[in-house]
UniProtKB/Swiss-Prot annotation:
One of its GO terms (cellular component) is phenylalanine-tRNA ligase complex. Residues 409-484 form the B5 domain. It comes from Bacillus cereus (strain ZK / E33L). This is Phenylalanine--tRNA ligase beta subunit. It is found in: Cytoplasm. It comes from the Bacteria. Mg(2+) binds at D462, D468, E471, E472. The keyword Transcription regulation does not apply. One of its GO terms (molecular function) is catalytic activity, acting on a protein. Belongs to the phenylalanyl-tRNA synthetase beta subunit family. Type 1 subfamily. Residues 712-805 form the FDX-ACB domain. The lineage of its organism: Bacteria, Bacillati, Bacillota, Bacilli, Bacillales. Tetramer of two alpha and two beta subunits. Binds 2 magnesium ions per tetramer. Its cofactor is Mg(2+).
Length: 806
């Protein structure tokens, strides 16, 4: 929001405050002033000149030789290249010695043999942004009104002795998107009164209702619509003071009627629209929702295709404007316009925002409707606009307005105690001081024993709860005046939760095992969202309503797909050995309309070499058992290794013979295995193994306590055993049977060999176990170990039909 310092002085007396001081004060009150721009940019020596004579330069067709009265004893000769220079005009002249933007000094010169004592200026040459210059003067010099005084300071007439404050408004302070809103803010800061604009409206005997009727079909989207007629206007330039104020506000002047609607927009914050009444095609205005596919050509000469939730202003059949966004070209005010219908309305911000976004079309009006306007100013704004059109466009304002009013503005009363204000702010402000602040804010209130009951004006929709009033007091008191204090309260010793401690253990172990932590997107594409799920889920993944792209449109149900993307990316760049893990959330869909269930998972991917250079010079390739070994070590650290088993499994996207479910106390909590060859081919990777498991379920299991014992004084005895079993026999189950059969003396069982070679009978395999027998109190005899070992042999023969391999 650009605020003209001189324009602001019309509403609040701040002549004793400089623009920079005002900017500092506003910033300290909670509204950031991003900058203060001096409009004249160091320009001096520019006056109003009267062109007495103008003829073609004898040596150059595109130059004119002019004799110009600049208010001095003698007129001066100036050579000018502007096409619109002519005798009798009053123009801005930079005299010899004048300074223009960029410290450009005007000197006497000769152009094609003719002396030139100065320079006739375009607005751009005086430092005005070319985008703000009206089309009439965009390619030529500026022309003053005929009543401009010769020799007068041109910058004063152009209002360039002004400074503009740029406010960086947050969305909740839409009340300051207009000059009156800023005036209320400044008046509250300095404790001064707001001078509201005077409206001098003279109406004719004819009535607006004789020319137009208004009906609203979409009452929820448009609770208030007001129309007023102004006849017999004469389209021309708006007065100089209005043009300069609009340019200071960042708006390009167009014509008197259009400029007046923009001026009211900047003054009241109430968007208006002016229709050429004679182009409406009927004597009625109907506000309705658009028909699907309905088309309209807007003022920017673009044809727009509307949707059924867009709000339009129509003549009963044809769309004339996109409500709250932009008018239509068919009813545009042009130089031929004679009769004007003014629109002032209150459109629902959500409707305007959605329409604006759908059409990719934003305007000053839509920005204000989106954030919310003051509905109590709608009538006042249209009356003021009609008065200005009567005065500056020669129009005749017809009596009254036509309106469709379904708006109910409810009073808002918010209460707060003085005790709460001081407690929250850490101040000691008296109740009387707070009352003065509410008075300065123009908030009517009553006070009962230190409790303020504040009636919030409609212009401040951001004030809804007591904390908002606390903020208002804090802003006006000055955040810089709030005393600095140390935190109070009992200091407590912080500690990690059990889950945090376990997550740190997981990270520390996996990084020690050579895996790197990755953090991937929680959003994925529809085709990847349901890949590699730990548990099947028939419900559709949770989709975003407005995704930025299809690649990031749904919440993930597994961590593996995103990790595989990272591995594929690395392998494509010649980083063939990759080991990654991620601790992150998946999002399980629940009942429709409910939030998804968020569950923390651990996933990992390993490919390439597990060991690059052993001391013997060997290299070890990642395989199923390498990855399984990593998980076994992790489960051991977490104290759940004895509760974990593995079961062969078939999962979509996984190798059918090299995949297993991870089972905790009989419940599947994850999986481990190699990618299916087709999946590896799609990702352009080889020998890639993955795992994923639910940390919630692992952490929810009681961990075994860790015990420490002295280094044994007595030796242990080791026996190896190789048995032939069917290929379907699970080594894990056999290991468990061996441990139970060996009794107390058997301390450790390790599978050290699996053989399925040519020497084995079809359908058979060999499993070799190493068993360690030990008693901490004595040395075992060979007979004791043999007895325990024989029990083991008997158990595996009976349970699995195993045959001792010789």
């Amino acid at each position: 929001m650009f605020v003209s310092y001189r324009w602001l002085q019309e509403y609040v007396d701040i002549k004793d405050v400089t623009a920079q001081e005002l900017a500092d004060k506003i910033t300290k009150s909670g509204i950031e002033v991003e900058g203060v721009e001096v409009l004249n940019k160091g320009v001096k020596g520019v006056v109003v000149g009267h062109v007495l004579e103008c003829e073609k330069h004898p040596e150059a067709d595109k130059l004119s030789k002019c004799l110009i009265d600049i208010g001095e004893e003698e007129p001066v000769q100036i050579i000018c290249g502007a096409a619109n220079i002519a005798k009798g005009l009053k123009v801005p002249v930079a005299k010899v010695g004048a300074v223009l933007p960029g410290n450009f000094k005007i000197k006497k010169a000769k152009l094609r043999g003719e002396a030139s004592h100065g320079m006739v200026c375009a607005l751009q040459e005086l430092g005005i942004d070319g985008k703000l210059v009206s089309k009439e003067y965009a390619d030529g010099i500026f022309i003053f009104p005929s009543d401009a005084e010769v020799g007068a300071d041109a910058l004063e007439i152009l209002n360039l002795h002004d400074e503009v404050l740029e406010l960086g408004l947050t969305p909740n302070r839409a009340d300051c998107l207009n000059m009156l809103g800023v005036a209320y803010e400044v008046a509250a800061i300095y404790g001064r009164e707001v001078k509201l604009p005077a409206i001098d409206l003279q109406e004719t005997a004819e009535k607006t209702s004789d020319y137009i009727s208004v009906s609203v079909e979409a009452k929820e989207e448009n609770p208030l619509y007001i129309a007023k007629m102004v006849k017999n206007v004469k389209i021309g330039p708006s007065p100089m003071w209005m043009q300069t104020r609009l340019m200071a506000a960042g708006i390009r002047p167009i014509s008197n009627v259009v400029d007046i609607t923009n001026y009211i927009l900047m003054e009241y914050g109430q968007p208006l629209h002016a229709f050429d009444y004679d182009k409406l095609g009927s004597k009625e205005i109907v506000v309705r929702l658009a028909k699907e596919g309905e088309k309209i050509e807007t003022l920017d000469d673009q044809e727009r295709t509307l949707q059924s939730h867009h709000l339009v202003i129509t003549n009963g059949t044809k769309a004339l404007a996109v409500a709250g966004v932009m008018g239509g070209a068919d009813s545009e005010v042009t130089n031929e316009t004679v009769n004007v219908l003014i629109e002032s309305a209150y459109f629902a911000g959500q409707t305007v925002r959605r329409t604006s976004k759908d059409l990719g079309l934003r305007s000053e009006s839509s920005a204000r409707f989106e954030k919310g306007i003051d509905p109590t100013r709608t009538f006042e704004a249209i009356q003021h606009a009609a008065a200005l059109m009567a005065k500056y466009a020669g129009g005749e304002a017809l009596e009254g307005v036509v309106e469709a009013d379904n708006l109910q503005v409810q009073e808002r009363t918010v209460s707060v105690t003085a005790e709460k204000v001081n407690r929250v702010l850490g101040t000691n402000i008296s109740a009387s001081e707070m009352g003065t602040m509410f008075t300065n804010l123009k908030f009517p209130f009553t006070e009962v024993e230190g409790t303020f009951h504040v009636n919030v004006p409609a212009r401040r929709p951001d004030i809804t709860i007591s904390e908002d009033l606390v903020e208002e007091v804090g802003r006006l008191y000055g955040y810089d005046h709030i005393p600095v204090t140390l935190p109070s309260g009992t200091m407590t010793r912080g500690k990690l939760t059990a889950a945090q401690t376990k997550r740190r253990k997981v990270r520390r172990f996996l990084e020690g095992a050579g895996l790197y932590e990755a953090i991937t997107y929680s959003l994925t594409s529809a085709d990847k969202a349901k890949q590699y799920m730990v548990e099947p889920n028939e419900k559709a993944p949770v989709a975003l309503a407005l995704p930025m792209s299809e690649e990031r449109s749904q919440l993930r149900l597994s961590l593996v797909p995103q990790l595989l993307e990272a591995v594929s990316y690395n392998v494509a760049r010649k980083n063939d050995s990759v080991a990654l893990y991620e601790v992150g959330s998946i999002f399980l869909p629940t009942e429709e309309g409910e939030l998804p269930k968020e569950e923390q998972h651990l996933a990992g991917v390993m490919t390439g070499l597990a060991l690059h250079h052993a001391w013997q010079g060997e290299k070890k390739v990642v395989d199923f058992f390498v990855v399984k070994g990593v998980l076994e070590g992790l489960f051991d650290v977490l104290g759940v290794s004895n509760q974990i088993t593995y079961a062969p499994a078939k999962r979509e996207g996984m190798h059918p013979g090299r995949t297993a479910d991870i089972v905790l106390d009989g419940e599947v909590i994850g999986f481990i295995g190699q990618l299916h060859p087709e999946a590896e081919k799609q990702l352009d990777v080889k020998n890639t193994f993955v795992f994923e498991l639910s940390l919630v379920k692992v952490f929810g299991t009681d961990a075994e306590e860790t015990y420490y014992s002295a280094i044994p004084r007595f030796p242990s005895m080791t026996r190896d055993m190789a048995v032939v079993v069917t290929k379907e026999t699970k080594a894990g189950e056999m290991k468990q049977v061996i441990a139970e059969a060996g009794g107390e003396l058997l301390k450790d069982v390790t599978l050290f060999d699996l053989y399925e070679g040519e020497k084995m009978e079809e359908g058979k395999k060999s499993l070799a176990f190493s068993m360690n027998y030990f008693d901490p109190e004595r040395t075992l005899t060979d007979e004791e170990v043999t007895e325990a070992h024989n029990r083991v042999l008997t158990a595996v023969e009976e349970k699995f039909g195993a045959e001792l391999r010789k």
